[in-house]
């Protein structure tokens, strides 16, 4: 049975022409106008790429540093031992531990958005793969979350660095700020995301790489973005 649309959503939907592709800044202004829920909604990007992630040379998993931040506090957990524990604490990690933290996570403790591990701890962290993998939280070198440079990694993730990947259908879903951001700040973050996706194009990607880009507030309607206009935009213009 079709889900009944709320009055709020219908009013937001009426502001968007579903047959139109919008210039990037106009799309983000619309995103703000359609963020009418009673909380500060996230700004989301949904990017459909011409890749088939079932092939290893068509997988996309990387990180983006959002120049205007994420708009939310990011809780970082670190698995390390020895002097690296103190380094992680000094750098501002929210949760730090060794084998005991691995056991806590194994039992279901998930009070963090980012999990970083030092390389020497990865053989022990491996047991968490089935638990963390589906949640996108498993530390990985590609994601910048397996590293000996804990100070830099913690600082970057706290400041707005995000890990993302294409799902099994080749779509990237990323929260790139809050609806309370200015359109210009949202555009700076969206541009950084676009450049990162282009820079990390999988070697096996063939044909047209960019298929579609939609943005939305987390409780709002989808707004189609002009891909070429976004890619042609220079960051100095943002």
Swiss-Prot record:
* Function (record text): Binds directly to 23S rRNA. The L1 stalk is quite mobile in the ribosome, and is involved in E site tRNA release.
Q: Which domain of life is it from?
A: Bacteria
Self-association state and partner proteins as the record states:
Part of the 50S ribosomal subunit.
Among the entry's GO cellular component annotations, what is one? large ribosomal subunit
PANTHER family documented for this protein: 54S RIBOSOMAL PROTEIN L1, MITOCHONDRIAL, LARGE RIBOSOMAL SUBUNIT PROTEIN UL1M
Similarity comment: Belongs to the universal ribosomal protein uL1 family.
Alphabetically, which GO biological process terms does the record hold?
regulation of translation; translation
What is this protein's name? Large ribosomal subunit protein uL1
Query: Pfam families this protein is in?
Result: Ribosomal_L1
Task: List keywords of the entry alphabetically.
Answer: Repressor, Ribonucleoprotein, Ribosomal protein, RNA-binding, rRNA-binding, Translation regulation, tRNA-binding
Organism encoding this protein: Rippkaea orientalis (strain PCC 8801 / RF-1) (Cyanothece sp. (strain PCC 8801))
List GO molecular-function terms, semicolon-separated: rRNA binding; structural constituent of ribosome; tRNA binding
NCBIfam families, A to Z: rplA_bact (TIGR01169)
